[in-house]
A protein has these predicted regions:
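N-terminal secretory signal peptides that target proteins for export/translocation
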Residues: 1-5
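Flexible, solvent-exposed loop/hinge segments and secondary-structure transition points
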Residues: 23-165
Length: 165
């Protein structure tokens, strides 16, 4: 009888522990970049850069840093494909522009080792997409001047500003 009492006690303890963790379980709700939002951002960024005669590539990533949309301008150089993606990934990962991140991770910074992470790049042109303080994605532009890349990326995000409120 002592053994079955211990077994019953153990079953009750395990069941109680499982029921409390089950009651704490929730569906996780997250905001993310929709396909239409990503397309709008990318198309706007390309159009903005074309006004200055620049042929660029644009990458938009979601909250997990996964590529959501990629557009390559008609005469954009092939290396800009990778650069646009890395700029977007950098802005998403660190929740700030790739230029701000580059400034924070200079050679004399205690954060300099972050530059060794795969897929990041210390070049201007990556801009986070935010809802309040939450980063839900990012856009990267490559093929203009570095300041031009960032301005075109910002124009893309500005186009969807009302949807980000």
């Amino acid at each position: 009888m002592g053994g079955s009492y211990r077994t019953l006690s153990l079953v009750i303890v395990v069941a109680a522990a499982m029921s409390s963790s089950a009651s704490d379980a929730q569906v996780l709700m997250q905001r993310d970049v929709s396909l239409h939002m990503a397309l709008t951002i990318a198309e706007t960024a390309i159009a903005e850069c074309e006004k200055s005669g620049n042929n660029v590539s644009v990458a938009v990533v979601d909250r997990a840093g996964r590529l959501r949309v990629f557009l390559q301008g008609d005469k954009a150089a092939p290396h800009n494909i990778e650069l646009a993606q890395r700029k977007a990934y950098t802005a998403r990962t660190f929740g700030r522009t790739s230029a701000e991140w580059a400034a924070r991770t200079g050679p004399d910074s205690e954060l300099a080792a972050q530059r060794q992470l795969e897929h990041v790049i210390a070049l201007r042109g990556g801009v986070p997409i935010k809802v309040g303080g939450e980063t839900i994605g990012a856009v990267g532009v490559s093929g203009s001047t570095s300041g031009g890349d960032e301005a075109c990326a910002m124009a893309g995000v500005a186009k969807v500003a009302d949807e980000l409120k």
